[in-house]
Amino acid sequence: MAIQTSNLGYPRIGLQREWKKTLEAFWSNKIDEEQFLTTMKEIRLQHVKVQQEKGIELIPIGDFTYYDHVLDTAYMLGFIPSRFSEFTSYLDVYFAMARGSKDHVASEMTKWFNTNYHYIVPEYEEGLQISLKDNRPLRLYEEAKQELGVDGKPVILGPYTFLKLAKGYTQEQFATILKQLVAPYVQLLSELHAAGAQVIQVDEPIFASLTKEEVQQAKEIYEAIRKEVPNANLLLQTYFDSVEENYEEIITFPVSGIGLDFVHGKEGNLHAISKYGFPADKTLAVGCIDGRNIWRADLDEVLTLFTTLQKQVQTKDFIVQPSCSLLHTPIDKTEETHLSTELFDALAFANQKLEELVLIHSALTKGTESISNELETYRNVHHTIRSSAVRNREDVKAARTALKEEDFSRPLPFEKRYELQQVALELPLLPTTTIGSFPQTTEVRQTRKEWRNGVISNEQYEKFIEKETEKWIRYQEEIGLDVLVHGEFERTDMVEYFGERLAGFSFTKNGWVQSYGSRCVKPPVIYGDVAFINGMTIKETVYAQSLTEKVVKGMLTGPVTILNWSFVRNDIPRKEVSYQIALALRHEIELLESSGIRVIQVDEPALREGMPLKEKDWDAYITWAVQSFLLATSSVANETQIHTHMCYSNFEDIVDAIRALDADVISIETSRSHGEFIDTLKHTTYEKGIGLGVYDIHSPRVPSKDEMYKIVEQSLEVCDPKYFWINPDCGLKTRRTEEVIPALEHMVQAAKDARSLLKTNA
């Protein structure tokens, strides 16, 4: 029996976020291209070296990127939109596609399946010449071989998933374009095989949610590829869920091995294997360590899994690997010594997960006695955290038990509430607002750092925050916005801020993961029962409201987003954790309302991303996600207006869920997705307050008034002007002041023009 250790992908960002810093230095012209490429190579090779030293046998090559692996694939295959044709160098084209430029909008960005990672959406255009423009995986494979002597495992995004994630073609064109991908993939794989690649990992995460017809279509493509590259050792890799529905067909694909997720798809994949077995002539790559969470594995459970598999499958060849790329986990926990011992011991970041793979390999090849000490340690760690007082609070349990049906609904229906709110708030037609945050300048970040390091006092820091808040209240008044925000200068991150003020959360010092491009986030760790402690946003919001006669919105992050953007305890259902968060937020919302705040926004940008990949599992998730939002927001008076915000989602899947949230106003990203939600509203109705984002805040370019007016015009074709709001796509935290002010001025002018037109046509 042959058993190997493997990894599917390693975090890109560097132990001290060297990758992020290098990218941003290059973008701001602080380093030149040569220095950029040299530093990136050093980081890339260091990651390979770490995995080599940890004892991983099949080390992924090509998972490293300058921005996004889907964008890498798009560039490699020639999926380059014509609007970027004026750029000549690779990096200029690449980063223009990712970030846009002064004159060109970026390609769309959206969530990578149900994770908090974002990918750049490939664009197909008529007349596109699909070819292998650049065999990047080959270059990186040869680099690792020459520089480190590592015969790595090239990782590529599979043709079917790639094209399914792309946009710009009709369904009728899909099959034709898919066939056009065969030639470049054949060339790519042929060259890798000729260079000596022993195993080539082909990622097809979309296989977890395909129809039988689609699987057959994908199989034909793999048969066409295999015909031309008969000797390449292809490992077909799936993850994020099981392939149960199509397992019987997938195991007949002409590949040498198949990777399955036995963490997030354990039940389905095991059921399929028990029914259909597994081919003797293929390698089974077992995703047995959670690549999306930060907890130590249950080694006993993993070894039991292998015992079950060895009884049920015909193959003798296994690969021990994570459930997915470790892109979604921080790199190393060794710096987190500030954490309690019980929590620190329970954690496993990427490097620790690699060590777990080696432990499992040892147990499988040498017997469990070879890791008997480690097994005992793991059992003790799991017992300690499970029985901890922070996970067994009686007050939290009592609050959950006491919930009644009326806790999940507003007293009056939307139409009647909105009438009362219009009287109370006295807002104009097509009111303007922003999504919440304003620029976190170098001064803001530096002052916060000084405060956290004890260089300045609490009083000095609070004075600084008040000064920034007042400055931006005045800016908003001058610009002419209708509903203002305090700017969130006191907040580092929209989830971390609340987690720091709620019981049950803990925070890492260096637990960074990539969200999109160079943007990294440090998710909170929900390790215990969540409960309210003290007011979290009252002071700053009430201060901002005291500065102006205009309405100021309270700003909170919703329970489902806090859940989905955190590393969550895995000993109770996610629904229960979400309800705990909702109850804590409910208390905060009641305090805001009693302090005179009449508009309260509860953001849920991550509602869609938490949905299971399989449609059959959607209803159960949506039910408790919506109930969580309602639990947080339903205790306010009818006159209090509840807003919510969403971005980067496939909204057509959740229109009914959005409606069920019963928010008085929802603001939704529209501009970067090129108006897709506007198209969705052409086929359905939305009868509540809605703001469709009129400009993309993730690009540095300042859009013209006319661009925004066009989106307003398109939106009003499908939205009732009585309920329509005008706002940017998202918060403005990452933008510069000189970008924000003119953009908002253009937005307000577009709103005024639209109001004038509506009055003229009335």
Swiss-Prot record:
Name of the encoding gene: metE
Pathway: Amino-acid biosynthesis; L-methionine biosynthesis via de novo pathway; L-methionine from L-homocysteine (MetE route): step 1/1
Family note: Belongs to the vitamin-B12 independent methionine synthase family.
Record-annotated active site: 698 (proton donor)
NCBIfam families: met_syn_B12ind (TIGR01371), PRK05222.1 (NF003556)
CDD domains: CIMS_C_terminal_like, CIMS_N_terminal_like
GO molecular function ontology, one term from the record: zinc ion binding
Keyword Amino-acid biosynthesis among record annotations: yes
Protein name from the UniProt record: 5-methyltetrahydropteroyltriglutamate--homocysteine methyltransferase
Residues bound to Zn(2+): 645, 647, 669, 730
Gene3D superfamilies the record matches: 3.20.20.210
Keyword terms of this UniProt record: Amino-acid biosynthesis, Metal-binding, Methionine biosynthesis, Methyltransferase, Repeat, Transferase, Zinc
EC number(s) stated in the UniProt entry for this protein: 2.1.1.14
GO biological process, one term: methionine biosynthetic process
Biological function: Catalyzes the transfer of a methyl group from 5-methyltetrahydrofolate to homocysteine resulting in methionine formation.
Residues noted as binding L-methionine in the record, renumbered to the chain: 435-437, 488, 603
Residues annotated as binding 5-methyltetrahydropteroyltri-L-glutamate: 17-20, 111, 519-520, 565, 609
Keyword Magnesium: no
Binding residue positions for L-homocysteine: 435-437, 488, 603
Cofactor: Zn(2+)
Cofactor binding annotation: Binds 1 zinc ion per subunit.
Catalytic function, reaction form: 5-methyltetrahydropteroyltri-L-glutamate + L-homocysteine = tetrahydropteroyltri-L-glutamate + L-methionine
